[in-house]
């Protein structure tokens, strides 16, 4: 038997070449974009918190080493995901940002050290507010004249969803602030959550009624709050902890974070009773250990603790870095684990033909959730080899019949992190990926190639649109919230129409009403005249669609939402994009070069676009679809700052702010701050003592500003 090649360790970020970094940056950016959408908008995460955090850490490390890769579309510059469209949008007066994470005690020490250096203080002179990190749905409540006027989810940090009617049903949210002398405008922020006991009771009722079972309290809280009918929300026992604020007119009611928490209580809000004031790093770490010990006994889910600089004036001085405040951090807990038996491995076929092994488990409770299924990713993962060739589980393979260790960190689909070899039965069966697709056609299965042309770890059915499993997944994507977003046409309805032969391709959706005289949908159980009329109205409402949504809805491999947006902005209109795609498919070198020059577009996407439009079948699908819909031109990105997208270098001594404060301000306004001067530099801000960088600026003809000129520029 030939020897298996030894898996390679992942390349350290410090050893990546610029070309390698660019490829991995694009891949990670797309992954993070998808997972942010699944978590924040769909309430349906597909990876664990630990997996997500690892993706984010590596992505941030690449951007730190190669800052030229950072763009306005980078996940590092965003928070959460855009509002879904099911509710009216609300723009936050003050953005709702996310937090950086600490995973080890050393990370906490570094966090405190950075703050002390920024403020030029000793570590022991800084007090911190410490509180449990509630695993729920972030919310902003706006009060005007003491009356609740708007409640909005976090969304993408800039815009959220208006859930005011639903929030009014929560007993923890006062309709009118208690007391008197409140600010004219006050935004109270916090977390909507569901207790573990309420979650279990709700799932029991859902099960008895034959309705959807929620995976965990966080998903149940999010799903309960984001209901169209407030009566449903009112029937769900939701709580709210207040812990922060957004816009406040005039002077804040307190000078410290802990003072604001007390003020929230006076106004009628519930705050977390475990919140503490800590005076040192040691006290922060002791608080983390104490809360972790209490975690299992708490009646609500938490996934860590949060530390915040207590003095509000220091918070304001520290400011923000990209999508996170510099003055706060989340100290996460390790993921929860359990052991169970892997009973079987089944194959699922995805939209692009990818074959994914799914492990069927002996049901086991992990963190309050009963887990029965687990993704096993691909054949290499099962063999103990990672995506980049690294060794997993010390090389131990996973076999049917094995006792496995399951890890869950607040997610829906957990992961196998280890195999208990001592418990492996003699009859345990190694897994071998089938050579043909499990679809009725049994078409051949091939391994996908990597970006370097090597055989990859993922297998794919070669049936393309002939494979019914792929066809139906394409249609589900087309009608999904992030594509055409057709209300009333969910996955179950798509599957039913497909099985009946009524919808075989996207254009069929828009001809349903014409064909309904023969189909008679209203006579089908579960429909009726009103629901059919509503469905047809919803379909008609989507006959106009944004270019980026249309491109995404085509379901081309490697063309997710971010890539679709980049293509839409690059070409501007459907006609221009369509013409370019046909030329790329025909091998036109000029068209290929033009597409390659677009931001975030590389060889993998170009090959995918070419392959898609080279197929007669696909071109026919597109042609028939464009006869039914109107595709709107792409909107140009808005630039609100005079220094947005500009590259700035600071040199010399700044007298009105620290260097860190100047850098933070520039980045907050959309500029890129560099440590060296080149021809691509737009501004050099020079203070007393400016040396070689000032000379370089003069050499390259870069505009040089004094500190006062800089402050005047950014004030415009």
From Swiss-Prot:
Q: Which intervals hold domain BRCT?
A: 638-716
Catalysed conversion reaction: NAD(+) + (deoxyribonucleotide)n-3'-hydroxyl + 5'-phospho-(deoxyribonucleotide)m = (deoxyribonucleotide)n+m + AMP + beta-nicotinamide D-nucleotide
Q: Does the keyword Nucleus apply?
A: no
Kindly report, in one word, the top-level EC class recorded for this enzyme: ligase
The UniProt entry's coiled-coil ranges are none
Q: Does the keyword Translocase apply?
A: no
Q: A Gene Ontology molecular-function term?
A: DNA ligase (NAD+) activity
Stretch forming the signal peptide: none
Pfam families, sorted: BRCT, DNA_ligase_aden, DNA_ligase_OB, HHH_2
Q: Which InterPro entries match?
A: BRCT_dom, BRCT_dom_sf, DisA/LigA_HHH, DNA_ligase, DNA_ligase_AS, DNA_ligase_CS, DNAligase_adenylation, DNAligase_N
**EC annotation?**
6.5.1.2
Instruction: Report the family membership.
Output: Belongs to the NAD-dependent DNA ligase family. LigA subfamily.
Entry protein name = DNA ligase
Organism of origin is: Bradyrhizobium sp. (strain BTAi1 / ATCC BAA-1182)
């Amino acid at each position: 038997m030939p020897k298996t090649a030894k898996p390679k360790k992942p390349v350290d970020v410090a050893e990546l070449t610029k070309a390698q970094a660019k490829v991995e940056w694009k891949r990670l950016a797309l992954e993070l974009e998808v997972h942010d959408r699944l978590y924040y908008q769909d309430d349906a995460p597909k990876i664990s918190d630990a997996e997500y955090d690892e993706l984010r850490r590596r992505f941030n490390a690449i951007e730190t080493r190669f800052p030229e890769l950072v763009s306005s579309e980078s996940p590092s510059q965003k928070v959460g995901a855009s509002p879904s469209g099911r509710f009216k949008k609300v723009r936050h007066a003050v953005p709702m940002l996310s937090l950086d994470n600490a995973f080890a005690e050393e990370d906490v020490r570094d966090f405190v050290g950075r703050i002390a250096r920024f403020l030029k203080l000793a570590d022991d002179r800084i007090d911190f507010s410490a509180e449990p990190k509630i695993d729920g749905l972030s919310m902003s409540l706006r009060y005007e004249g003491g009356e609740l006027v708007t409640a909005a989810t976090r969304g993408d940090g800039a815009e959220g969803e208006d859930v005011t009617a639903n929030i009014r049903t929560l007993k923890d949210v006062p309709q009118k602030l208690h007391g008197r002398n409140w600010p004219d405008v006050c935004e109270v922020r916090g977390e909507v959550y569901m207790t573990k006991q309420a979650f279990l009771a709700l799932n029991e009722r859902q099960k008895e009624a034959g309705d959807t079972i929620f995976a965990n309290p966080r998903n149940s809280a999010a799903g309960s709050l984001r209901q169209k009918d407030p009566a449903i929300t009112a029937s769900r026992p939701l709580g709210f902890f207040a812990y922060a604020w957004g816009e406040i007119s005039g002077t804040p009611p307190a000078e410290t974070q802990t003072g604001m928490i007390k003020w929230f209580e006076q106004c009628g809000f519930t705050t977390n009773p475990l919140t503490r004031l800590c005076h040192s790093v040691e006290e922060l770490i002791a608080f983390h250990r104490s809360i972790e010990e209490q975690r299992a006994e708490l009646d609500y889910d938490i996934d860590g603790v949060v530390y915040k600089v207590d003095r509000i004036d220091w918070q304001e001085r520290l400011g923000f870095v990209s999508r996170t405040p510099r003055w706060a951090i989340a100290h996460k807990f390790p993921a929860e684990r359990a052991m169970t038996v892997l009973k079987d491995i089944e194959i699922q076929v995805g939209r692009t033909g990818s074959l994914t092994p799914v492990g069927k488990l002996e049901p086991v409770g992990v963190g309050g959730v009963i887990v029965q299924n687990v993704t096993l990713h691909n054949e290499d993962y099962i063999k103990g080899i990672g995506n980049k060739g690294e060794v997993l589980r010390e090389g131990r393979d996973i076999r049917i019949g094995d006792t496995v260790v399951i890890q869950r960190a607040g997610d829906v689909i957990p992961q196998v992190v280890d195999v208990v070899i001592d418990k492996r039965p003699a009859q345990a069966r190694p897994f071998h990926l089938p050579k043909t697709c499990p679809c009725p056609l049994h078409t051949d299965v091939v391994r996908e190639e990597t970006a370097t042309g090597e055989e990859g770890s993922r297998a794919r059915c070669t049936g393309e649109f002939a494979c019914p499993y792929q066809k139906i997944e394409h249609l589900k994507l087309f009608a999904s919230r992030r594509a055409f977003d057709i209300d009333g046409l969910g996955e179950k309805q798509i599957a039913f129409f497909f099985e009946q032969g009524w919808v075989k391709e996207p254009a069929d959706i828009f001809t349903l009403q014409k064909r309904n005289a023969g189909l008679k949908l209203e006579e089908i159980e579960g429909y009726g005249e009103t629901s059919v009329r509503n469905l047809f109205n919803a379909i008609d409402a989507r006959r106009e669609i944004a270019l980026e949504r249309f491109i995404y809805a085509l379901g081309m491999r490697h063309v997710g939402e971010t890539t679709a947006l980049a293509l839409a902005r690059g070409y501007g209109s459907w006609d221009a994009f369509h013409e370019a795609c046909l030329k790329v498919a025909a091998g036109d070198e000029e068209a290929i070069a033009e597409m390659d020059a677009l931001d975030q577009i590389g060889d993998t996407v170009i090959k995918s676009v070419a392959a898609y439009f080279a197929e007669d079948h696909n071109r026919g699908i597109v042609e028939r679809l464009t006869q039914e819909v109107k595709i709107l031109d792409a909107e140009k990105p808005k630039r609100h700052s005079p220094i947005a997208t500009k590259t700035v270098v600071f040199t010399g001594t700044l007298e009105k702010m620290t260097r860190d404060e100047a850098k933070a301000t520039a980045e907050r306004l959309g500029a890129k701050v560099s440590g060296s001067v080149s021809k691509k530099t737009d501004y050099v801000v020079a203070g007393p003592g400016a040396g070689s960088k000032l000379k370089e600026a003069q050499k390259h003809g870069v505009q040089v500003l004094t500190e006062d000129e800089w402050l005047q520029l950014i004030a415009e």
